[in-house]
Amino acid sequence: MTTAKRLAMRLKFLMKSIIPMTLAATWLAGCATPPPPRLAIWDAAELGRIEIVRQHLAAGTDVNAGGGITGLSALHQAAFHGHTAIAGLLIAAGADVNATSRRGETPLHSTVYWERREIAALLIANGAAVNAKLENGQTPLDWAVQLGAADMAEFFRSQGGESAD
């Protein structure tokens, strides 16, 4: 067998097997969307698991999806539990700063319980309605007054917050 024939046979083998497999593997690795993690995005936000939140964002998880019986979003959970970096990441990914739970609670309402002023400021800076109302008409300022969170009440007033009364 001549050298030219051997070379032609090797080239034919490469064209039929190795090259298509290599191209397919490269295409699949570069184009595939990773699956979402098993831990729900709102649970990851509640627990402060920023890497899992990032994995959800890479997988295309809906950042505004509400979870459980309350319908709280991942941003609600991050706000309530004081995870500022996660709140910022979610906002940058398009989370609705005025999303409402089943009873009308916004992420801004969620900041009141534990006096998460830094997150409240982040939400307001990104368009959160400072006078958003629950289904019973309470604003974040009303909650702050009711819970005795004087610093939060003062902060909301400084941002234009009003009482529903």
Regions found by a protein language model. Name each.
Residues 37, 70-71, 104, 137:
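Start-of-repeat signature of ankyrin repeats
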Residues 52, 85-86, 118-119, 151-152:
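Conserved ankyrin/ankyrin-like repeat signature
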Residues 67-68, 101, 134:
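Ankyrin repeat boundary/linker residues
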